[in-house]
């Protein structure tokens, strides 16, 4: 962002650059429309400079970023879009722990712990 030019919000990325169209999708790959929603962050169309392969391991790149959802680039991040259209990364979708059959993101647990005023910072490893 450009200082004093780009409007910013704490904990949020700025608005998308021109030509980059982020979308949120559910587990089935259906686009989640509207604001005030959460889902998996994908990029709808290719853009200059986008990752297309990894040297020496094209298949790994294809599987990780292009095979999860048809015709979308999947970042691997969970994300929320607020009322103003700003995006906040909520954590990696593959960074989860299983507690009694419930999949819980480690970032969610860290955020809950960090709500306590006596906790400066926490890290959860599962």
Residue ranges and their predicted role:
Residues 25-26, 67, 75, 81:
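Hydrophobic alpha-helical segments, especially N-terminal targeting/anchoring helices
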Residues 1-10, 26-28, 56-60:
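Active-site loops of AMP-binding adenylate-forming
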Residues 1-4, 20-22, 50-54, 97:
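Adenylate-forming
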Residues 19, 60, 118-121:
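Glycine-centered tight turns that cap/initiate beta-strands
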Residues 15-20, 92:
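A short, compositionally biased
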Residues 23-45, 50, 83-84:
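Conserved beta-loop-beta connector loops within the AMP-binding
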Residues 9-16, 32, 64, 69-70:
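Short Gly/Pro-enriched turn/cap motifs at secondary-structure boundaries
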Residues 47, 52-53, 71, 78-126:
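AMP-binding/adenylate-forming catalytic core of the ANL superfamily
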């Amino acid at each position: 962002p450009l200082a004093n030019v780009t409007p910013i919000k704490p904990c949020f990325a700025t608005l998308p650059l021109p030509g980059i169209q982020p979308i949120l999708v559910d587990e089935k790959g259906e686009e989640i429309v509207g604001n005030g929603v959460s889902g998996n962050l994908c990029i709808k169309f290719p853009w200059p400079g986008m990752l297309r392969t990894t040297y020496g391991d094209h298949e790994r790149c294809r599987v990780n970023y292009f095979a999860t959802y048809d015709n979308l680039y999947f970042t691997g991040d969970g994300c929320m879009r607020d009322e103003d259209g700003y995006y906040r990364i909520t954590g990696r979708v593959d960074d989860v722990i299983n507690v009694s059959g419930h999949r819980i993101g480690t970032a969610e647990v860290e955020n809950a712990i960090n709500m306590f005023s006596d906790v400066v910072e926490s890290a959860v490893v599962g």
